[in-house]
Amino acid sequence: MKTYSRISTLLALFLTLALVPSALAQQQNQKNFPWMNTSLSPDERADLVVKQMTLDEKINMVHGQGMLGWANKTFPNMHLGNGGAGFVLAIERLGIPSLQISDAAYGVRSSAQNGRYSTALPSNLASAASWDTEGACEYGALIGRELRAQGFNMTLGGGVNITREPRNGRTFEYMGEDPILAGTLVGHRIKCEQGQKVIGHIKHYALNDQESGRNEVNVKIGKREMRETDLLAFEIGITIGNPGAVMCSYNAVNGDFACENKYLLNDVLKNNWKFPGFVTSDWGGTHSTEKSSAAGLDMEQPEDLFYGPKLKEAVEAGRVPMAQLDDHVRRVLRSMFATGIVDDPPQRSMIDVEAGFETSRKLAENSIVLLKNSNAILPLDRNKVRSIAIIGHNADMGMISGGGSAQVDPPGPPPKWLQHVWFPTSPLKAVKAKAANAKVQFDSGSDPAKAAALAKQSDVAIVFVHQWTSEGEDLPSLSLPDKQDALIQQVAAANPRTIVVLETGTAVTMPWLDKVSGVLEAWYAGSKGADAVANILFGDVNPTAKLPMTFPRSEADLPHPTVRTPPPGAKDIALRMKAQDEPTYSIEYDEGLKVGYKWYDAEKKPVLFPFGFGLS
């Protein structure tokens, strides 16, 4: 038995050693490929690869290989993915690695289901409130590092749709209502993200300014109005950040779906702006083969309904020119070479959790906006305040985060789609740590009378309220949900020394504003949001952030007082399973150039808090 075991071991060792020269030779051959010459430009290197590719290799380069749970399908190559949003096959014989793609709006998504960890940063809207390009750079660099540490080489972050509709469920993913501010900050985020050797990304191109009817709606807008508002943010972001990829959106614009819209993709993006990278569809946002290819869509995600066998057949039949397919492929390869993911593929490594926490806290401190400070209630004097009431749902446990494909997983099991997720950053604990000599008590606010009683017997009441928003749905109104306005009213009536901390993804109305002494807008504050809030409350950090969007008095003052939803009988379904030539219904952005503060100024409408407002 021992002899047999020894022989087996020696045989295995012999076979392993026999394979080593072959593997080393293959690696050496790949290094000698002419496109591995780093002195060549990304364009030159990409051109050399394209000339060596077969038709099947080219087709595989322009579509995804599936996503776990997508459309209840199984995909044969899923074992080659990295557990993210999707992937593109490697071309191993030519030394080209796979694209491993992850959502990463405010941190790397889906880490829990893959046994990993990701830092949750403050939301993109919070980042915009900092008005800080260096902070935006830190934001992108951290996400880039954590993407690579988890084995990803492409991000799906970089949202920059401007705030035309503040009830949009994805407002928290974007950079506010001003195209110059939004484009500048997203550009610096992307630039520093790509500095970590991942493909950066900007989305959703274009005019995906609401979630209601996003797969069905046709946006009507003039070309000048489009170019000087929504597209301007993209133009600035692309100029500064030079992202490797642009994601086209679900909606149609002036009659053509964005992912087959020649004006958006070829005329403006590639020809006018000279964008050298590639355009990928939003997930399930491709509607055709020949029209999409001719319009400038380079990649279908996350599967191959239109850019797999159908595209191959169209090329072979001459309906899609080979030169057109080559351009799609070359653009993908160019971005891979330009960002360094071919020369230096990511290697999985441990994430520096403490460094992530430190960055998240610092960015949150720079993003919290002080909206009201009557009688200088802030900063709180820890030597004078003897009793503090902490009131609010889950304020003893954590702070709310934004949902959908942006959702960063907290420690523990992966959350379900559209589940409300609270990060374990406890306001109660953070305040207790700052006010060690005070009596700090908690009430959930589920019984407003009980919460008011606690507030009445306390020197100060701090009410933490939240507004959950997510991809896939818009808010019915800008009011706080779950009767939280009434809770604040009752607490403030019991103790006018009430401070409200808003955890929101967009603007909110404040019928109680004149009854409270202080208001902080903390947005979705990330992994260390509670510490950041406490540092502001007690004066360890001076708030410097300014609003990146207008807070209106009510929905009646908006350009469109009601969210425009699909008409009766029209379902807002994902069109990933079929082609569709026409969107179901249209909305007209008749406010034109008057977006955000320009609307309120031109229409002489008073606001609750103007764009750019923030106290110190």
Q: What do these predicted ranges mean?
A:
Residues 10-20:
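Bacterial N-terminal signal peptides
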